[in-house]
Amino acid sequence: MIRSSFVRSLPAVLTAFVIASCSGAGGVDSTGPLGQSPDATATAGSGLELNALWWKDWHRDVVTVSKTIDATGGTISIPETGLTMTFPQGAVAAPITITVTSDAEYVAYKMAPAGTKFLKDVIVTQSLSTTEVAGETLKRQLSAAYIADDTVSLSGKVPVSEIEPSYTTFSAGSSPLPLAHTWIIRHFSRYMLASG
């Protein structure tokens, strides 16, 4: 009986150990969402330029999803790109139709209505299985970046306005691979996943 209990809990213990060991010195924080801390704030990106991540399959179809979110909260997902947005209860005071459009080449999204501000943090999770880093070890830390100008090209170095509080989730094992990147947003318009 004790042995079967130990065997059942072993995967959870090993996962916790791997996560703890990955959060030490090095690039990526995989410990938990910074958005859960009241002190977590976006970092001003003034003068900062980053490279947008590419989709794994070039020239991916642009996907647009719309959904009405009300004061009870809700979720918007784009399965084709691996995006999930979770709106907690109280994020908006009144019903609002949210539209999210993926970029054809880069791991980036336009979110509307532009200028929308949220009363509570919205949690965004991007599966990395659809991106250029799928199945690869990370060479550089990933960042979720806000781009104030919806018309700026995402090719090359992209000027960003904010770096959002975020973390990367990794697989367990001797060579952890990135699985997803999660960040918080407090307002809309355009966001991308990027590296330095």
Where are these regions (language model features)?
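C-terminal motif of bacterial Sec signal peptides marking the signal peptidase cleavage site
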Residues: V18-S21
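A mature extracytoplasmic/lumenal domain signature
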Residues: A91, A104, L128-T130
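Short beta-strand elements of extracellular/lumenal beta-sandwich folds
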Residues: A104-A112
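Proteolytic cleavage junctions
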Residues: S23-T84, G90-I98, A114-L119, E132-G196
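Bacterial N-terminal signal peptides that target proteins for export
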Residues: I2-P11
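Short edge beta-strand/loop segments characteristic of extracellular beta-sandwich folds
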Residues: T86, T125-S129
